[in-house]
Curated annotation (Swiss-Prot):
Transmembrane residue ranges: 20-42, 61-81, 94-113, 114-134, 148-168, 195-215, 225-245, 258-278, 285-304, 308-330, 351-371, 380-400, 436-456
InterPro entries on file: NADH4_N (IPR000260), NADH_Q_OxRdtase_chainM/4 (IPR010227), NADH_UbQ_OxRdtase (IPR003918), ND/Mrp_TM (IPR001750)
Protein name: NADH-ubiquinone oxidoreductase chain 4
Role, per record: Core subunit of the mitochondrial membrane respiratory chain NADH dehydrogenase (Complex I) which catalyzes electron transfer from NADH through the respiratory chain, using ubiquinone as an electron acceptor. Essential for the catalytic activity and assembly of complex I.
Taxonomic source organism: Danio rerio
Membrane topology designation: Multi-pass membrane protein
PANTHER family: NADH-UBIQUINONE OXIDOREDUCTASE CHAIN 4 (PTHR43507:SF20)
Keywords: Electron transport, Membrane, Mitochondrion, Mitochondrion inner membrane, NAD, Respiratory chain, Translocase, Transmembrane, Transmembrane helix, Transport, Ubiquinone
Similarity-based family: Belongs to the complex I subunit 4 family.
């Protein structure tokens, strides 16, 4: 754990001490080095399942894929941000990269925490850099409104969790995940216990977000700069799913009765957000709503608590993290050239940027879960688990996948095909940096297709 955490912390002096000429080069190279070191976590040597560096930090098959995803994304975010941050004063550039590195530090400590209270603190700490990135480097004036939504939704959801954790500490005497998963089931039968159960999960359902608690997400995504959108879609939403998986083990007897309304909301959200996507004109908003739909499937898979549901959820979280991040990068490359997120005003780009169209096509196919990509594997496992739980869910999930395919193709055709609008007269060609960025997003998806057991979690 420390072999990644210490180099990440050492990024801070690197950022502030390197000369302005070499700032982006050194930080990109160092973060790539950290990303490659983190791949060693995937080689599992421990017999117990837990690979602990001390009593506070440990990795297990559930957190390892998410830790590696976090480390993999930092260099990609730095690469994606170079163009639009380069024109700012050097100290602001340093501040921006510092915020991205601090986000990675908090995420590693959140996914690697063995004490739930430490996970909670790091879960909340990620809020501050994300909020600064959205409200300081966002594109439009609405970014302050988006930041307010983001802050208050997350805080309002998280306060009950803190109270619930203090009550858990009082009743069991420990908040260690290692101890709690082997302790006797808690006898939960009163109304107070049911409220406590909801308090444990609401924070994670807001973060995922569950349909109905999702209004902060499209606003935050649309207003955030490219790196903010990437980290939000790829890793911050996954904190919610990861936290739910960790907490569900302890809430077992009650979840069987109380999870129904949340499963219904999650599945209903898959269809509703898909239909919303079909009516979107804003490219980033469409990708943001598609994230809500995919995370609805993940929430459904986790809430029914079967091994297939859990495995499908973690596979879909990793695959969706890479895919949605790639889509936001592509949306940014088109925005940097046309200065518009409205799809009708930025259409027909296949004529000008043919290779970028290939990346759009692959990313959209991954988004609609084309076989044999891991997105399909995750969705199939969740759909199968839900079908075993109740055969009627196949109607909802089947319609959901159909609508997903529809809006993915709608996004591709609207942004790439057709004639170029008359107001677009001068477009710069694609940079090698952008092609490298897309390659590094899509290569892991293809490699995971060949060896999916790297992200199967505990079911391996």
């Amino acid at each position: 754990m420390l072999k990644v955490l210490i180099p990440t912390i050492m990024l801070f002096p690197t950022i502030w001490l390197s000369s302005s000429k070499w700032l982006w080069t050194t930080t990109t190279m160092n973060s790539f080095l950290i990303a490659f070191i983190s791949l060693t976590w995937l080689k599992w040597t421990s017999d117990t399942g837990w690979n602990a560096s001390n009593s506070y930090m440990a990795a297990d098959p559930l957190s390892t894929p998410l830790l590696v995803l976090t480390c993999w994304l930092l260099p990609l975010m730095i690469l994606a941000s170079q163009n639009h941050i380069n024109s700012e004063p050097v100290n602001r550039q340093r501040m921006y990269i510092t915020l991205l590195a601090s986000l990675q530090t908090f995420m590693i400590m959140a996914f690697g925490a063995t004490k739930i209270i430490m996970f909670y603190i790091m879960f909340e700490a990620t809020l501050i850099p994300t909020l600064i990135i959205i409200t300081r480097w966002g594109n439009q004036a609405e970014r302050l409104n988006a930041g307010t939504y983001f802050l208050f939704y997350t805080l309002a959801g998280s306060l009950p969790l803190l109270v619930a954790l203090l009550l858990l500490q009082q009743s069991t005497g420990t908040l260690s995940m290692l101890v709690l998963q082997y302790s006797d089931p808690l006898l939960l039968n009163s109304w107070g216990h049911k409220i406590w159960w909801a308090g444990c999960l609401i924070a994670f359902l807001v973060k995922m977000p569950l349909y109905g608690m999702h209004l902060w997400l499209p606003k935050a995504h649309v207003e955030a700069p490219v790196a903010g959108s990437m980290i939000l879609a790829a890793v911050l939403l996954k904190l919610g799913g990861y936290g739910m998986m960790r907490m569900m083990v302890m809430l077992d007897p009650l979840s069987k009765q109380l999870a129904y309304p949340f499963i219904i909301l999650a599945l209903w959200g898959v269809i509703m957000t898909g239909l919303v996507c079909l009516r979107q004109t804003d490219l980033k908003s469409l990708i943001a709503y598609s994230s809500v739909g995919h995370m609805g499937l993940v929430a459904g898979g986790i809430l029914i608590q079967t091994p297939w549901g859990f495995t499908g959820a973690i596979i879909l979280m990793i695959a969706h993290g890479l895919t949605s991040s790639a889509l936001f990068c592509l949306a940014n490359t088109s925005y940097e050239r046309t200065h518009s997120r409205t799809m009708i005003l930025a259409r027909g780009l296949q004529m000008v940027l043919p290779l970028a169209t290939v990346w759009w096509f692959i990313a959209n196919l991954a988004n609609l879960a084309l076989p044999p990509l891991p997105n399909l594997m995750g969705e199939l496992m969740i759909i199968t688990a839900l079908f075993n739980w109740s055969p009627w869910t196949i109607i909802i999930t089947g319609m959901g996948t159909l609508i997903t395919a529809n809006y993915s193709l709608y996004m591709f055709l609207t942004s790439q095909r057709g004639s170029i609008p008359e107001h677009i007269t001068n477009l710069s060609p694609s940079h090698t940096r952008e092609h490298l960025l897309m390659t590094l997003h899509l290569i892991p998806i293809i490699l995971l297709m060949l060896k999916p057991e790297l992200m199967w979690g505990w079911c391996n």
